[in-house]
Amino acid sequence: KGNELSGIIDFYFAANDYFMYEIAICINALCFDKHKTKFRINKRKIMNLIKGYESVKKISEKEKSSLNILCRGAAMRYFLTRLYDFTNTPKTALIKIKDPKEYYQKLVIHNNLKTYKDYLK
């Protein structure tokens, strides 16, 4: 905020191939708001994320055209990982099992968006 650092995102473990996959993972993790049991996409957060990202690295038109499929892929990845853990982790395990339905909802939202501009407006 202002001239103060308010956060750092380490993209190293997100991916090392497609830079837009980094954005897709961040959108899924940071750009949804929860209202009771429902998730809603927050396009203002997406715009701010992209603005900050592009202050360092410009996003090409080709990359922009891949945003939707990468967001869906990232949501599917987390949904399936959580679903596996939900169904296969013993009740006695000392880890917190996360609800896979969160990422199912996000996947449905991504399926209703198609273009890069759909994420911003």
Give the positions of each predicted feature.
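Active-site acidic catalytic loop and adjacent metal/ATP-binding pocket
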Residues: 1-21
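Short amphipathic alpha-helical segments and their helix-coil junctions
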Residues: 4, 8, 50-61
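Secondary-structure capping and boundary motifs in well-ordered enzyme cores
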Residues: 15, 71-72
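Short, conserved loop/turn and helix-capping segments at secondary-structure boundaries
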Residues: 13, 17, 43, 97-100
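ATP/Mg2+ or Mg2+-diphosphate-binding catalytic cores
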Residues: 78-121
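Active-site activation/catalytic loop segments of kinase-like enzymes and analogous catalytic loops
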Residues: 20-57, 74-90
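A general structural signal for well-ordered secondary-structure junctions
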Residues: 33, 59, 113-116
